[in-house]
């Protein structure tokens, strides 16, 4: 289950999840992908970086 909102600040992050996963799987640096997506807050960035698919 993908994260819908940041647990700390409440910003919606689910809209960025698929793009982030695709680009990182293609070999891009996660930092550069998050910068391009416009995620500046470290709390929002960790929501995508630390997510693990368990299903």
From Swiss-Prot:
Top-rank EC class of the record's enzyme: transferase
Keyword flag Mitochondrion: no
Keyword Membrane appears in the UniProt entry: no
Gene Ontology biological-process entries: DNA-templated transcription
Catalytic activity: RNA(n) + a ribonucleoside 5'-triphosphate = RNA(n+1) + diphosphate
Keyword vocabulary terms for this entry: Cytoplasm, DNA-directed RNA polymerase, Metal-binding, Nucleotidyltransferase, Transcription, Transferase, Zinc
Note on how the cofactor is bound: Binds 1 zinc ion.
Cellular component aspect of the GO annotation: cytoplasm; DNA-directed RNA polymerase complex
Domain of life: Archaea
EC number: 2.7.7.6
Principal location listed in the UniProt entry: cytoplasm
Binding positions for Zn(2+) per the UniProt entry: 6, 9, 43-44
Pfam family name, one: RNA_pol_N
Gene3D superfamilies tied to this protein: Homeodomain-like (1.10.10.60)
Names of required cofactors: Zn(2+)
Subcellular location: Cytoplasm
InterPro entries: RNA_pol_su_RPB10, RNA_pol_suN_Zn-BS, RPABC5/Rpb10
Molecular function (Gene Ontology), one example: DNA-directed RNA polymerase activity
Assembly with partners or alone: Part of the RNA polymerase complex.
Family: Belongs to the archaeal Rpo10/eukaryotic RPB10 RNA polymerase subunit family.
General function of this protein: DNA-dependent RNA polymerase (RNAP) catalyzes the transcription of DNA into RNA using the four ribonucleoside triphosphates as substrates.
Protein name in the entry: DNA-directed RNA polymerase subunit Rpo10
Protein source organism: Methanothermobacter thermautotrophicus (strain ATCC 29096 / DSM 1053 / JCM 10044 / NBRC 100330 / Delta H) (Methanobacterium thermoautotrophicum)
Taxonomic lineage from the root: Archaea, Methanobacteriati, Methanobacteriota, Methanomada group, Methanobacteria
């Amino acid at each position: 289950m993908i994260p819908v909102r940041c647990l700390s600040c409440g910003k919606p992050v689910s809209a960025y999840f698929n793009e982030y996963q695709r680009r990182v799987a293609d070999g891009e640096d996660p930092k550069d992908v998050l910068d391009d997506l416009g995620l500046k807050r470290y709390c929002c960035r960790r929501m995508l970086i630390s997510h693990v698919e368990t299903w």
